[in-house]
Every structure is written in C-alpha cells, then in structure tokens.
C-alpha cells in the first residue's frame, strides 16, 4: 500500500558533510605547496648547475702543501672566470687539473648507487667536491715569459731579475731548498706551494712532459675565499705588493 504521507512530503537531501569541503581545501593547499616546492628546488638546482659550470665551483683542500694559507680539508670557492675571462696574475692561488704525472695513481673508494646519487646531488649545489683529489692547489709564482731563479745571494726567488720577499710564507720557511732556473712558456704558469718543504710543485716535475709548467688548459680557476669551516673563513689574497716591482719579461 502506498503511503500518502511519503508521496506528499518532499524528499530531503542528505546533509552535506562540512568537513569534506575543508578536507578538499587542505588537500589543494598541500598539492599547491608541493608543486611550488618542486619548482623552487628545480629552479635552484638549474641555477646552481649554471653557476657551477660557468662561474664558481667548490673544492676541498686534500693536502698540506699550502699551509698555513690553507688547512687540510678547508673548502674553497674557485672563480672559474680565471684565466679564460679574467687574466691570471702572479700570487693567485689556483686550482688546476693534474697536467700529467703530478699526482701519480689516485685511489678512489667505490660508492654504492645511493651514495653516488647523493654525492652528485650535493655537488650540483656546490656542497661537495668529489673530484678534489684529482686536482691540485698552488700559488702562481710566474706567468708566461717570466724568468724565475732560485736563489739570489740572500736566498730569495728572483723573477725577471727582481728579488721578491714572499710575505705569504710562514716565518722560518725558505723560498726553496731546490735550485732552479726556468723561463715560463707563454700560455703556462709556474706554481709553488706555500709550505715549501712539503709541496710537490713545479720544482719537482721537470722530468715530465709538462716540464713542471701548468698549461692554461689545465687551470680550473682562482681560489677566492675559504668557505668552510667558518672559523677559517677569509678572502684569499694574491699579495700583489710582493710582485709589484717585478719588471715585464
């Protein structure tokens, strides 16, 4: 039997759940946040890659050859515009690839795929420098055409006949215990570590094809600042006053 009351009374819609609208709103906010975050991180990564490729790069110092200017494991920021855009100068602290035989055989520790991925990601932001052990850090003593001799009667290096007082060396460190007389080829540099007694630099590679010189093609750039640890933070001076009176070759 049909219930007349049911026919005459209007159907009532089920009440809406007020919480569902709020849930959808929160979900949309979360999705929007995730998308924005991915865009920001992606943009930062691309920008960092561009900066790393064309402007600056981070390295760590693997040895004590530049003590006490640079400490072992210091992290340095390198200006990659030097020397291709900005000319290299005497006194610059430079990072360069092994010109051939300077480092010998460099052993590397195998990494798991996860470790390699994390290292790649961090290096893209300049937070790590996984290839630092394949590079060297030294100070430029001579540029193309310079005639460098060790040593003068008072034990100093001479460049183009002018003796220099190397104020970046720690007290008591001799300019060199090894005598040499070289002329730097055009397009190359002559480099030495500030820790002269513990630096396998240009002086010790004259028997190699490079003759101890570093060609421009191997130079990564000029180290401009110690960025880590914060206690060591400082701009790296090229001590222009040391070389200001050196005549042109």
Where are the regions that the model predicts?
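Extended hydrophobic leader/signal-anchor segments used for secretion and membrane insertion
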Residues: 1-249
């Amino acid at each position: 039997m049909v219930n007349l009351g049911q026919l005459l009374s209007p159907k009532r819609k089920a009440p809406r759940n007020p919480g569902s609208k709020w849930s959808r709103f929160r979900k949309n906010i979360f999705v929007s946040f995730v998308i924005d975050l991915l865009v920001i991180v992606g943009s930062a990564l691309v920008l960092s890659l561009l900066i790393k490729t064309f402007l600056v790069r981070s390295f760590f110092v693997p040895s004590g050859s530049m003590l006490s200017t640079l400490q072992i494991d210091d992290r340095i920021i390198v200006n990659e515009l030097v020397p291709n855009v900005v000319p290299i100068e005497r006194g610059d602290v430079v990072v360069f690839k092994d010109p051939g035989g300077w480092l010998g055989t460099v052993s590397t520790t195998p990494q798991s795929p996860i470790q390699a991925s994390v290292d790649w990601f961090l290096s893209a932001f300049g937070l790590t420098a996984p290839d630092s052990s394949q590079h060297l850090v030294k100070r430029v003593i001579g540029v193309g055409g310079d005639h460098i001799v060790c040593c003068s009667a008072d034990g100093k290096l001479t460049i183009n006949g002018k003796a220099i007082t190397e104020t970046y060396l720690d007290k008591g460190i001799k300019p060199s215990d090894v005598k040499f007389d070289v002329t730097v080829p055009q397009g190359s540099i002559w480099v030495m570590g500030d820790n002269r007694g513990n630096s396998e630099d240009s002086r010790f590679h004259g028997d190699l094809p490079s003759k101890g010189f570093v060609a421009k093609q191997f130079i990564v750039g000029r180290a401009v600042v110690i960025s880590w640890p914060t206690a060591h933070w400082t701009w790296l001076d090229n001590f222009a006053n040391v070389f200001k009176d050196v005549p042109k070759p």
